[in-house]
């Protein structure tokens, strides 16, 4: 089971800088009644994040009602790519609300048409059909459904296999967790699909062999033949560690998929819309998938997701056979269009690339200083993961990672709870609007948190 942060107010050092302000004990004593209500009325699973009661957020900063201000390195779990509450998104939402159309199911509306066309134009060929959804889990399950249906039509009842990767995360619904690669999240599933096959992810840290031959050998050892595979799905970078695969591996994978009429699916839910310094993360690999799943940063705010893909695949189902209750909700669509336009046309992709270089340089210095407990640093653009390990080895150290996040929170630097293998990865993902000065200040604060956590754990 994951760990909950302590909700008992603790006196901490005051902070007052351009980007951070801590003026109360943490959490703020006045916020405790709200925290207690949430813990009383919500499931325990909702207690896993640092106990700040958000009041408002702007740009790359988050505020409570009690005078505290955090530099946000979470983006609300990689959602607010365009920044928190930018005026363009707020105005788009207000305009749509005032227009008076709040929901219309799958009946046509102009707003949905504009967003679908815009996404179709910015996506590379042949990804020209757009199916709007609500959540990332919905998108990944839809992509697998399309891949299997395509496989059945192309190769008959035996071509239904789905290949995914160990350590991968594709959502929390049944199908999404079956294709996911985290065993602890599957313990409740008593009848795992025997036609879902997993292979090691070539991150170069926990999987040393990053050759595509290892992929082929793993499938062969499992008795999986290419003719029985309908699709391969992978995160563009593994969310649990911000880990990318080697370019040559992905290019070989794409070639193998083409040769065997297998759909290649990129889960871009964390990677798309500028996060990695490219519009779509798969651009780093020089390939184009058959389907991609989008979410999170597509709207920088409201719930929107999408599957974007080849027309022949997207059109497999006939009228009314593949729909969703809230597909293309007009308010969410308005937010998404404003978000994507701001990212694409407002220089945020370029900023992510430039600021990412500064971020990774600073993190490399921290990793070098703490080489005994930082097993690896992964990332590109404005996403990074510090893989914390038990001193001198590769075993993940979830305790020190948790301590680092907690200490950073007390210093006015907001990260979400550790993720990845053994809960050992401190993940960093600020809004793409962040500035050089804010990054440098955040790196310094994170360095202090790691210094303190390292000293405390060494003394135990």
Locations of the language-model features?
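Conserved N-terminal phosphate-binding loop of PLP-dependent enzymes in the Aspartate aminotransferase
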Residues: 2-460
